[in-house]
Amino acid sequence: TVSYEYDSMHRMTSSTNAKGGVTQFAYDERGNQTSVTDPSGYTWISSYDLANQLIGRTDPEGKATKYTYNLAGRLLSRTKPGERTAAVTYDKNYNVISLTDPKGYVYSYTYDKDNRQTEGKDPLKQSVKTAYDPGSCVTAVTDKMGLMEQYEYDPHGNIIQRTDTKGLHTRFQYDILDNLTSVTDPM
């Protein structure tokens, strides 16, 4: 049996596992979880800015991870001890246009006028491209090897056929309520 306790604000304050181990949770006056102490007594501490965004987390060994955000509240960076900073950049519509991982590898993304991701490139500049119909349904995905998978839809937006990179078709059928009723795999 696992049991839970809550405070007057309906926030979990403790959980007791089947072996009797208790994990405790603490919160600040704004409801942000500020600490978690596991059954072994190890504590993780979290801190927040005035916008209630997580800006730091310290593990039981005292190693602190830091987070930064832009004015719109979107994550800009995460810095862990002993690692490079992982970073995110956005376009004017807040689409992610690049991710830099802790190893320094950069992934980039492009979007169409409707803010749909049309291409993603890995650190080696190998890309995956995505095409859409006017209703924003994905019609094709071309992988980094240039192989294309295609999709067809009914007027309700239900996928009715998927053509894989080998040209094999998987067909989908729906009832009048748009519930999937059958899938026919390629033979």
Give a label for each model feature.
Residues 1-17, 21-38, 42-59, 63-80, ...:
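Beta-strand elements of repeat-based all-beta scaffolds
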